[in-house]
Amino acid sequence: MKRRRVLAATGSAAALAGCLSVPSQQPSSDRLLEDALETVSTVEDVSARRALTVEVPDSRTERVADVTKRPPTDRRLEMVDSSDLSVPAGAVSVRTTTTTWEYDPETDTAIERHHPNRILADVNRLTLESLREEYDHSYSRTDTVDGRDAHALLAKPDHDEDELTRSIEFLVGETAYQIPLERSDDDALEDPTVERLVWFDDATRYPIKERTTVRDGEAVVSELTLTYEDLSLDDGVGEEPFTYEPPAGSTIETVGTEPVGIYDSRAEAAEVAPYELPEPEIPGPFERDRIVVLEKGDELGTSTTLWYGDPDDPERELFVAVRDEQRFDPDALEGDRIDDLDVYCRDGRIQTLFWRCAELTYEVSSPYSDEPLEEVASSIGCPSV
């Protein structure tokens, strides 16, 4: 569970080293987004102080937090100052691939959330791809943010105003915010518009500030501003920021099913799994990352999930799951034939092949549509028959 990407030997990597000290030539908005996507795809770790302000006509909320991230999922956030009663100063959130801890100092309660089989996704990458593909964008201006030379990009949704729903959800940093487009059930906005300004550090092209403004005609309905201060990339933060021990005496609550175990080797997992584990042939560059054994009672049974990832691209994943209780509906899926297997296909955000062998069911899945799922399924076959 310690896969790390290798920085590509490209111009972006040179930029990360800080070789640019003056504003570069004005780039196009397309170039800004492409450079930013390359940066967030190769950066190893990020540390910053994050200042967030949310303003509406009758109130203003501020949060200041220290953030350490190791993309795509590891993150530590410590709230330094906050006027938001729901997230007070002293609140802590620590997330890894398999677990999230959230500590509330007001109640002295720590919540441990288990998610050992969650697909990895880099929020910054998804946000940048959304800006590139779902917004009309243009270069706005040069600027200075926290003493850094920066380029600002202006973006507006590329769909008609009639398509705007009751609310628009924005991914800002590591948090999803809903900005209402109706003041109340009986008071819809008459002429809503949304405008986003995103600032990119000139030296690294990392996004360091964002402002999202919702207007009704000329009136500002809400404005959200986020700024990264004292930004540092690739400092080698190590494991310590992503480990967490609740304060002594605090109340601990658990959400989600705690796994029987998370194992590095097949032999260790085989000792606790109640059935024979498959031995799939996984193509390179995939390497096994972890094996998760979960027990979910008589109704859902025991599942064992073998996770594989690309060491140079942590978001590129593939997993094989075996279960003693069937969780797919053949009548709702498209059937196919692979060698001697009757498989059922599911398309969508995750591409999946399901099949049944005697008392066990198997699944091969990946969020990437071009992965060799059929070859992996064929290599597993029906080991339980």
Describe each model-derived feature in a short phrase.
Residues 146-248:
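Gly/Pro-enriched, hydrophobic low-complexity segments
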Residues 22-23, 31-105, 157, 180, ...:
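N-terminal mature ectodomain segment of secretory-pathway/periplasmic proteins
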